[in-house]
Amino acid sequence: MTDKPKQYVKEMFFRPQHLHFTGIGGIGMSGIAEVLLNLGYQISGSDVKLSPITERLAAMGARVFEGHAASNIAGARALVVSSAVDEQNPEVQEARRISIPVIPRGELLAELMRLKYGIAVAGSHGKTTTTSMAATILNYAGLDPTVVVGGRVGTMGGSNARVGHSDFLVVESDESDGSFLKLAPIIAVVTNVDREHLDHYPDLDAIRAAFLEFVNKVPFYGAVIVCLDDANVQGLLPEIRRRTITYGTTAQADMEAGDISCGPFASEFRLRYRTADLGRFRLHIPGRHNVLNAMAAIAVAMELEVKPDTIREALETFSGVDRRFQLRGQERGIAVVDDYGHHPTEIRATLDGARQCGFRRIHVLFQPHRYTRTFHLMDEFARSFHQADSLFVMDIYAASEKPIPGVTAESLVERIRQFGHRGVEYVGTLDRGVDALVAAASEGDLVLTLGAGSVYQAGEKVLERLRTEGKG
Protein backbone atom coordinates (compact mmCIF):
# COMPACT_ATOMS: atom_id res chain seq x y z
CA MET A 1 0.00 0.00 0.00
CA THR A 2 1.35 3.43 -0.94
CA ASP A 3 2.21 5.74 1.94
CA LYS A 4 -0.02 8.57 0.66
CA PRO A 5 0.72 11.13 3.41
CA LYS A 6 4.49 10.72 2.97
CA GLN A 7 4.14 10.91 -0.81
CA TYR A 8 2.08 14.09 -0.47
CA VAL A 9 4.74 15.67 1.75
CA LYS A 10 7.45 14.72 -0.77
CA GLU A 11 5.47 16.24 -3.62
CA MET A 12 4.85 19.39 -1.61
CA PHE A 13 8.54 19.78 -0.68
CA PHE A 14 9.88 19.02 -4.12
CA ARG A 15 7.39 21.26 -5.91
CA PRO A 16 9.73 23.73 -7.66
CA GLN A 17 9.71 27.22 -6.15
CA HIS A 18 12.05 30.17 -5.76
CA LEU A 19 14.46 30.18 -2.80
CA HIS A 20 17.07 32.87 -2.16
CA PHE A 21 20.33 32.04 -0.33
CA THR A 22 22.02 34.87 1.57
CA GLY A 23 25.69 33.89 1.64
CA ILE A 24 25.33 31.41 -1.22
CA GLY A 25 29.11 31.20 -1.73
CA GLY A 26 29.66 29.48 1.60
CA ILE A 27 30.70 25.85 1.32
CA GLY A 28 27.70 24.61 3.30
CA MET A 29 25.12 26.87 1.68
CA SER A 30 26.31 26.20 -1.86
CA GLY A 31 25.96 22.43 -1.47
CA ILE A 32 22.28 22.64 -0.54
CA ALA A 33 21.68 25.21 -3.29
CA GLU A 34 23.22 22.84 -5.84
CA VAL A 35 21.03 19.93 -4.70
CA LEU A 36 17.88 22.06 -4.95
CA LEU A 37 18.90 23.37 -8.38
CA ASN A 38 19.13 19.78 -9.55
CA LEU A 39 15.68 19.10 -8.09
CA GLY A 40 14.19 21.86 -10.23
CA TYR A 41 14.07 24.73 -7.76
CA GLN A 42 14.60 28.30 -8.91
CA ILE A 43 17.61 29.45 -6.91
CA SER A 44 19.00 32.92 -6.43
CA GLY A 45 21.61 34.04 -3.96
CA SER A 46 24.07 36.69 -2.93
CA ASP A 47 27.49 36.95 -1.37
CA VAL A 48 29.93 39.68 -0.48
CA LYS A 49 32.30 38.53 -3.24
CA LEU A 50 31.86 36.25 -6.22
CA SER A 51 34.01 33.11 -6.34
CA PRO A 52 34.53 29.89 -8.29
CA ILE A 53 31.72 28.40 -6.17
CA THR A 54 29.24 31.12 -7.15
CA GLU A 55 30.37 30.90 -10.77
CA ARG A 56 29.64 27.17 -10.75
CA LEU A 57 26.15 27.77 -9.36
CA ALA A 58 25.49 30.50 -11.91
CA ALA A 59 26.52 28.13 -14.71
CA MET A 60 23.98 25.64 -13.36
CA GLY A 61 21.20 28.23 -13.54
CA ALA A 62 21.29 30.12 -10.27
CA ARG A 63 21.02 33.90 -10.32
CA VAL A 64 23.86 35.21 -8.17
CA PHE A 65 24.30 38.78 -6.94
CA GLU A 66 27.51 40.36 -5.69
CA GLY A 67 26.67 42.10 -2.43
CA HIS A 68 23.56 41.97 -0.26
CA ALA A 69 20.55 44.16 -1.09
CA ALA A 70 16.82 44.08 -0.42
CA SER A 71 16.08 44.03 -4.15
CA ASN A 72 17.97 40.73 -4.56
CA ILE A 73 15.19 38.67 -3.01
CA ALA A 74 12.39 39.85 -5.30
CA GLY A 75 10.05 36.97 -6.09
CA ALA A 76 11.55 34.55 -3.55
CA ARG A 77 9.19 32.33 -1.56
CA ALA A 78 11.69 31.94 1.29
CA LEU A 79 15.12 33.17 2.39
CA VAL A 80 17.83 30.68 3.42
CA VAL A 81 20.57 31.99 5.73
CA SER A 82 23.69 30.64 7.39
CA SER A 83 24.59 31.32 11.02
CA ALA A 84 27.00 34.03 9.80
CA VAL A 85 24.06 36.17 8.57
CA ASP A 86 22.46 38.40 11.21
CA GLU A 87 19.16 40.28 11.47
CA GLN A 88 20.76 43.51 10.26
CA ASN A 89 21.39 42.06 6.82
CA PRO A 90 19.28 44.01 4.28
CA GLU A 91 17.96 40.82 2.71
CA VAL A 92 16.83 39.47 6.08
CA GLN A 93 15.18 42.80 6.88
CA GLU A 94 13.36 42.76 3.55
CA ALA A 95 12.21 39.17 4.11
CA ARG A 96 10.78 40.18 7.48
CA ARG A 97 9.06 43.19 5.91
CA ILE A 98 7.32 41.18 3.19
CA SER A 99 6.63 38.27 5.55
CA ILE A 100 8.41 35.42 3.80
CA PRO A 101 10.05 32.69 5.90
CA VAL A 102 13.69 33.09 6.93
CA ILE A 103 15.07 29.54 7.11
CA PRO A 104 18.38 28.63 8.78
CA ARG A 105 20.57 26.44 6.60
CA GLY A 106 20.45 23.62 9.14
CA GLU A 107 16.66 23.58 9.11
CA LEU A 108 16.55 23.22 5.33
CA LEU A 109 19.09 20.39 5.48
CA ALA A 110 16.93 18.69 8.11
CA GLU A 111 13.91 18.93 5.80
CA LEU A 112 15.90 17.24 3.04
CA MET A 113 16.88 14.48 5.46
CA ARG A 114 13.34 14.01 6.78
CA LEU A 115 12.34 12.58 3.40
CA LYS A 116 15.40 10.31 3.07
CA TYR A 117 17.37 7.67 4.95
CA GLY A 118 19.99 9.98 6.39
CA ILE A 119 23.62 9.32 7.26
CA ALA A 120 25.06 12.28 9.19
CA VAL A 121 28.76 12.67 10.00
CA ALA A 122 29.55 14.79 13.04
CA GLY A 123 32.72 15.57 14.96
CA SER A 124 35.04 18.42 15.80
CA HIS A 125 37.54 17.30 13.14
CA GLY A 126 37.59 15.01 10.10
CA LYS A 127 33.95 15.44 9.09
CA THR A 128 34.55 16.51 5.51
CA THR A 129 36.99 13.73 4.67
CA THR A 130 34.86 11.09 6.40
CA THR A 131 31.66 12.24 4.69
CA SER A 132 33.42 12.32 1.31
CA MET A 133 34.81 8.81 1.78
CA ALA A 134 31.42 7.43 2.83
CA ALA A 135 29.74 9.07 -0.16
CA THR A 136 32.42 7.72 -2.51
CA ILE A 137 32.00 4.17 -1.22
CA LEU A 138 28.18 4.21 -1.33
CA ASN A 139 28.14 5.67 -4.82
CA TYR A 140 30.73 3.15 -6.05
CA ALA A 141 28.61 0.36 -4.55
CA GLY A 142 25.57 1.50 -6.54
CA LEU A 143 23.58 2.98 -3.65
CA ASP A 144 23.46 6.31 -5.54
CA PRO A 145 23.14 8.67 -2.53
CA THR A 146 22.40 12.37 -2.51
CA VAL A 147 25.36 14.09 -0.84
CA VAL A 148 26.00 17.45 0.84
CA VAL A 149 29.55 17.93 2.12
CA GLY A 150 31.75 20.82 3.24
CA GLY A 151 34.47 20.47 0.63
CA ARG A 152 35.00 19.88 -3.06
CA VAL A 153 35.45 16.16 -3.71
CA GLY A 154 37.38 14.69 -6.65
CA THR A 155 35.13 11.64 -6.93
CA MET A 156 32.13 13.99 -7.20
CA GLY A 157 33.55 15.93 -10.13
CA GLY A 158 35.08 18.57 -7.88
CA SER A 159 31.69 19.48 -6.41
CA ASN A 160 30.54 19.58 -2.79
CA ALA A 161 27.13 18.09 -3.62
CA ARG A 162 25.48 15.47 -5.78
CA VAL A 163 21.89 14.41 -6.38
CA GLY A 164 21.29 10.68 -6.33
CA HIS A 165 18.15 8.79 -7.25
CA SER A 166 17.97 6.56 -4.17
CA ASP A 167 16.48 7.29 -0.77
CA PHE A 168 19.92 7.67 0.86
CA LEU A 169 21.26 11.08 1.91
CA VAL A 170 24.83 11.50 3.19
CA VAL A 171 25.57 14.84 4.88
CA GLU A 172 28.32 16.55 6.80
CA SER A 173 26.60 17.95 9.87
CA ASP A 174 27.43 21.27 11.52
CA GLU A 175 27.89 21.40 15.27
CA SER A 176 29.32 24.93 15.22
CA ASP A 177 25.95 26.57 15.92
CA GLY A 178 24.10 23.53 17.24
CA SER A 179 22.16 23.09 14.00
CA PHE A 180 23.12 19.41 13.76
CA LEU A 181 20.54 18.79 16.47
CA LYS A 182 17.83 19.46 13.88
CA LEU A 183 18.89 16.36 11.95
CA ALA A 184 17.34 12.92 12.45
CA PRO A 185 19.66 10.43 10.72
CA ILE A 186 19.34 6.64 10.77
CA ILE A 187 23.14 6.42 11.05
CA ALA A 188 25.11 8.98 13.07
CA VAL A 189 28.91 9.15 13.05
CA VAL A 190 31.02 10.98 15.64
CA THR A 191 34.69 11.21 14.68
CA ASN A 192 35.83 13.05 17.83
CA VAL A 193 34.76 15.70 20.34
CA ASP A 194 37.02 18.67 21.10
CA ARG A 195 37.06 22.20 22.52
CA GLU A 196 35.89 24.09 19.45
CA HIS A 197 33.31 26.77 18.60
CA LEU A 198 33.61 28.29 22.05
CA ASP A 199 31.83 31.35 20.72
CA HIS A 200 28.66 29.19 20.74
CA TYR A 201 29.29 26.68 23.55
CA PRO A 202 30.25 27.86 27.05
CA ASP A 203 32.55 24.90 27.74
CA LEU A 204 33.51 21.35 26.81
CA ASP A 205 30.68 19.89 28.90
CA ALA A 206 28.15 21.74 26.74
CA ILE A 207 29.84 20.42 23.60
CA ARG A 208 29.72 16.86 24.92
CA ALA A 209 26.05 17.27 25.84
CA ALA A 210 25.22 18.43 22.31
CA PHE A 211 26.94 15.43 20.72
CA LEU A 212 25.16 13.09 23.13
CA GLU A 213 21.80 14.59 22.20
CA PHE A 214 22.71 14.24 18.52
CA VAL A 215 23.46 10.50 18.66
CA ASN A 216 20.47 9.70 20.85
CA LYS A 217 18.16 11.14 18.18
CA VAL A 218 18.92 8.10 16.00
CA PRO A 219 15.85 5.81 15.80
CA PHE A 220 15.87 2.48 17.63
CA TYR A 221 16.59 0.60 14.39
CA GLY A 222 19.53 2.85 13.46
CA ALA A 223 23.19 2.87 14.48
CA VAL A 224 25.74 5.16 16.10
CA ILE A 225 29.35 4.89 14.88
CA VAL A 226 32.02 6.45 17.12
CA CYS A 227 35.81 6.61 17.43
CA LEU A 228 37.03 4.77 20.51
CA ASP A 229 40.49 6.38 20.26
CA ASP A 230 39.00 9.74 21.30
CA ALA A 231 38.86 10.26 25.08
CA ASN A 232 35.87 12.59 24.94
CA VAL A 233 33.94 10.10 22.81
CA GLN A 234 34.76 7.38 25.35
CA GLY A 235 33.10 9.58 27.95
CA LEU A 236 29.86 9.61 25.96
CA LEU A 237 29.57 5.82 25.65
CA PRO A 238 27.85 5.12 29.01
CA GLU A 239 25.04 7.52 28.06
CA ILE A 240 24.48 6.53 24.43
CA ARG A 241 21.11 4.77 24.26
CA ARG A 242 21.34 3.42 20.72
CA ARG A 243 23.14 0.49 19.10
CA THR A 244 26.78 1.56 18.91
CA ILE A 245 29.68 0.49 16.69
CA THR A 246 33.15 1.57 17.83
CA TYR A 247 36.27 1.91 15.68
CA GLY A 248 39.88 2.72 16.45
CA THR A 249 43.38 1.35 16.88
CA THR A 250 42.68 -0.59 20.07
CA ALA A 251 41.61 -4.22 20.44
CA GLN A 252 38.63 -3.01 22.48
CA ALA A 253 37.01 -1.48 19.37
CA ASP A 254 34.50 -3.36 17.22
CA MET A 255 36.56 -2.31 14.20
CA GLU A 256 40.34 -2.20 14.70
CA ALA A 257 43.05 -0.91 12.37
CA GLY A 258 46.51 -2.41 12.73
CA ASP A 259 49.82 -2.60 10.89
CA ILE A 260 49.40 1.04 9.81
CA SER A 261 52.03 2.36 7.41
CA CYS A 262 52.23 5.83 5.90
CA GLY A 263 54.30 6.97 2.94
CA PRO A 264 54.35 10.04 0.70
CA PHE A 265 50.68 10.89 0.13
CA ALA A 266 49.44 7.39 1.00
CA SER A 267 48.46 5.15 3.92
CA GLU A 268 47.86 1.43 4.34
CA PHE A 269 46.34 -0.58 7.17
CA ARG A 270 44.90 -3.99 8.03
CA LEU A 271 41.32 -4.07 9.30
CA ARG A 272 39.52 -6.35 11.74
CA TYR A 273 35.75 -6.08 12.16
CA ARG A 274 34.64 -8.01 15.21
CA THR A 275 36.05 -11.50 14.51
CA ALA A 276 36.60 -11.08 10.76
CA ASP A 277 39.93 -10.13 9.19
CA LEU A 278 38.99 -7.84 6.29
CA GLY A 279 42.53 -7.61 4.91
CA ARG A 280 44.53 -4.55 3.91
CA PHE A 281 43.18 -1.22 2.69
CA ARG A 282 45.06 1.53 0.87
CA LEU A 283 44.36 5.28 0.88
CA HIS A 284 45.83 7.91 -1.42
CA ILE A 285 46.05 10.35 1.48
CA PRO A 286 48.54 10.19 4.38
CA GLY A 287 48.21 10.14 8.13
CA ARG A 288 46.83 8.08 10.98
CA HIS A 289 43.94 10.53 11.32
CA ASN A 290 42.85 9.70 7.79
CA VAL A 291 42.99 5.98 8.58
CA LEU A 292 40.48 6.71 11.36
CA ASN A 293 38.34 8.77 8.98
CA ALA A 294 38.35 5.88 6.51
CA MET A 295 37.32 3.44 9.24
CA ALA A 296 34.23 5.51 10.04
CA ALA A 297 33.27 5.52 6.36
CA ILE A 298 33.90 1.76 6.13
CA ALA A 299 31.67 1.17 9.17
CA VAL A 300 28.86 3.15 7.51
CA ALA A 301 29.19 1.09 4.34
CA MET A 302 29.26 -2.23 6.19
CA GLU A 303 26.17 -1.21 8.13
CA LEU A 304 24.48 -0.84 4.72
CA GLU A 305 25.80 -4.30 3.70
CA VAL A 306 28.43 -3.15 1.21
CA LYS A 307 30.99 -5.93 0.68
CA PRO A 308 34.57 -5.39 1.96
CA ASP A 309 36.09 -5.90 -1.50
CA THR A 310 33.78 -3.23 -2.94
CA ILE A 311 34.79 -0.86 -0.14
CA ARG A 312 38.47 -1.57 -0.81
CA GLU A 313 38.06 -0.81 -4.53
CA ALA A 314 36.08 2.37 -3.79
CA LEU A 315 38.74 3.75 -1.45
CA GLU A 316 41.36 3.19 -4.17
CA THR A 317 39.42 5.72 -6.29
CA PHE A 318 39.31 8.35 -3.53
CA SER A 319 41.89 11.07 -4.19
CA GLY A 320 40.98 13.37 -1.32
CA VAL A 321 39.13 16.62 -0.70
CA ASP A 322 40.02 20.15 -1.72
CA ARG A 323 42.22 21.83 0.91
CA ARG A 324 42.75 18.62 2.90
CA PHE A 325 46.51 17.95 2.59
CA GLN A 326 46.14 18.81 -1.08
CA LEU A 327 49.26 18.75 -3.23
CA ARG A 328 49.31 22.04 -5.15
CA GLY A 329 52.43 21.18 -7.10
CA GLN A 330 56.16 20.47 -6.98
CA GLU A 331 59.05 22.60 -8.19
CA ARG A 332 62.80 22.04 -7.80
CA GLY A 333 62.14 19.00 -5.59
CA ILE A 334 59.98 21.04 -3.20
CA ALA A 335 56.39 19.87 -2.57
CA VAL A 336 53.76 22.55 -1.91
CA VAL A 337 50.70 21.34 0.02
CA ASP A 338 47.64 23.19 1.30
CA ASP A 339 45.50 22.18 4.27
CA TYR A 340 42.39 23.64 5.89
CA GLY A 341 43.56 22.78 9.41
CA HIS A 342 42.86 25.70 11.75
CA HIS A 343 42.37 24.04 15.16
CA PRO A 344 45.29 22.77 17.27
CA THR A 345 44.14 19.15 17.03
CA GLU A 346 43.89 19.38 13.23
CA ILE A 347 47.28 21.07 12.98
CA ARG A 348 49.00 18.38 15.05
CA ALA A 349 47.37 15.60 12.99
CA THR A 350 48.35 17.26 9.71
CA LEU A 351 51.95 17.83 10.80
CA ASP A 352 52.25 14.28 12.14
CA GLY A 353 50.98 12.97 8.80
CA ALA A 354 53.39 15.24 6.92
CA ARG A 355 56.32 14.04 9.01
CA GLN A 356 55.44 10.42 8.16
CA CYS A 357 55.73 11.27 4.45
CA GLY A 358 59.51 11.45 4.77
CA PHE A 359 60.18 15.08 3.83
CA ARG A 360 63.59 16.47 4.79
CA ARG A 361 62.21 19.61 6.43
CA ILE A 362 58.73 21.09 6.85
CA HIS A 363 58.07 24.83 6.45
CA VAL A 364 54.64 26.11 7.51
CA LEU A 365 52.77 29.32 6.72
CA PHE A 366 49.92 29.55 9.23
CA GLN A 367 47.02 32.00 9.25
CA PRO A 368 45.08 31.97 12.54
CA HIS A 369 41.31 31.92 11.98
CA ARG A 370 39.00 34.02 14.20
CA TYR A 371 39.96 36.09 17.22
CA THR A 372 37.74 34.03 19.54
CA ARG A 373 39.39 30.74 18.57
CA THR A 374 42.88 32.24 18.96
CA PHE A 375 41.93 33.66 22.36
CA HIS A 376 40.35 30.49 23.77
CA LEU A 377 42.98 28.08 22.40
CA MET A 378 46.15 30.21 22.59
CA ASP A 379 48.14 27.70 24.67
CA GLU A 380 46.89 24.74 22.62
CA PHE A 381 48.09 26.49 19.45
CA ALA A 382 51.44 27.15 21.11
CA ARG A 383 51.95 23.39 21.59
CA SER A 384 50.84 22.36 18.09
CA PHE A 385 53.72 23.27 15.76
CA HIS A 386 56.74 21.38 17.08
CA GLN A 387 56.81 19.09 14.02
CA ALA A 388 57.40 22.15 11.81
CA ASP A 389 61.05 23.04 11.24
CA SER A 390 60.10 26.63 10.48
CA LEU A 391 56.82 28.42 11.12
CA PHE A 392 55.68 31.72 9.66
CA VAL A 393 52.54 33.30 11.12
CA MET A 394 50.22 35.67 9.25
CA ASP A 395 47.80 38.12 10.80
CA ILE A 396 44.54 36.68 12.15
CA TYR A 397 41.78 36.11 9.59
CA ALA A 398 38.81 37.80 11.26
CA ALA A 399 35.93 35.93 9.54
CA SER A 400 33.60 38.86 10.38
CA GLU A 401 34.66 38.95 14.05
CA LYS A 402 35.73 42.10 15.82
CA PRO A 403 39.30 42.22 17.21
CA ILE A 404 39.90 41.24 20.84
CA PRO A 405 42.42 43.48 22.64
CA GLY A 406 45.74 41.69 23.09
CA VAL A 407 44.82 38.82 20.76
CA THR A 408 47.12 39.19 17.76
CA ALA A 409 49.37 37.10 15.55
CA GLU A 410 52.35 38.70 17.32
CA SER A 411 51.08 37.55 20.73
CA LEU A 412 50.56 34.04 19.34
CA VAL A 413 54.11 33.99 17.97
CA GLU A 414 55.48 35.03 21.35
CA ARG A 415 53.46 32.29 23.07
CA ILE A 416 54.74 29.67 20.60
CA ARG A 417 58.31 30.79 21.39
CA GLN A 418 57.61 30.51 25.12
CA PHE A 419 56.50 26.91 24.56
CA GLY A 420 59.87 26.07 23.03
CA HIS A 421 59.62 26.52 19.26
CA ARG A 422 62.86 28.12 18.03
CA GLY A 423 61.91 28.56 14.36
CA VAL A 424 58.77 30.71 14.55
CA GLU A 425 58.51 34.15 12.93
CA TYR A 426 55.76 36.73 12.49
CA VAL A 427 55.28 37.70 8.82
CA GLY A 428 51.88 39.43 8.86
CA THR A 429 50.96 39.49 5.18
CA LEU A 430 50.58 36.78 2.55
CA ASP A 431 53.33 38.23 0.36
CA ARG A 432 55.83 38.33 3.22
CA GLY A 433 54.87 34.76 4.04
CA VAL A 434 55.58 33.71 0.46
CA ASP A 435 58.98 35.44 0.63
CA ALA A 436 59.82 33.57 3.83
CA LEU A 437 58.78 30.18 2.45
CA VAL A 438 60.77 30.60 -0.77
CA ALA A 439 63.86 31.63 1.19
CA ALA A 440 63.57 28.69 3.61
CA ALA A 441 62.74 25.77 1.31
CA SER A 442 65.25 23.48 -0.41
CA GLU A 443 65.11 20.23 -2.37
CA GLY A 444 63.37 17.45 -0.45
CA ASP A 445 61.39 19.88 1.72
CA LEU A 446 57.66 20.41 2.19
CA VAL A 447 56.00 23.82 2.08
CA LEU A 448 52.66 23.65 3.91
CA THR A 449 50.02 26.38 4.01
CA LEU A 450 47.64 25.99 6.96
CA GLY A 451 44.40 27.77 7.82
CA ALA A 452 40.75 28.32 6.95
CA GLY A 453 41.10 31.83 5.54
CA SER A 454 42.99 33.17 2.52
CA VAL A 455 46.35 31.46 3.18
CA TYR A 456 45.67 28.90 0.42
CA GLN A 457 46.51 31.66 -2.09
CA ALA A 458 50.17 31.40 -1.07
CA GLY A 459 50.70 27.97 -2.64
CA GLU A 460 50.55 29.02 -6.28
CA LYS A 461 52.61 32.13 -5.53
CA VAL A 462 55.35 29.96 -3.99
CA LEU A 463 55.31 27.59 -6.98
CA GLU A 464 55.55 30.50 -9.42
CA ARG A 465 58.49 31.99 -7.51
CA LEU A 466 60.27 28.64 -7.46
CA ARG A 467 59.74 28.28 -11.21
CA THR A 468 60.90 31.76 -12.14
CA GLU A 469 63.76 32.13 -9.67
CA GLY A 470 65.18 28.63 -10.08
CA LYS A 471 65.16 28.18 -6.32
CA GLY A 472 66.42 24.79 -5.25
From Swiss-Prot:
The keyword Cell division applies. NCBIfam families: murC (TIGR01082). Coiled coil: none annotated. Its EC number is 6.3.2.8. One of its GO terms (molecular function) is UDP-N-acetylmuramate-L-alanine ligase activity. Keywords: ATP-binding, Cell cycle, Cell division, Cell shape, Cell wall biogenesis/degradation, Cytoplasm, Ligase, Nucleotide-binding, Peptidoglycan synthesis. This is UDP-N-acetylmuramate--L-alanine ligase. The gene is murC. Signal peptide: none annotated.
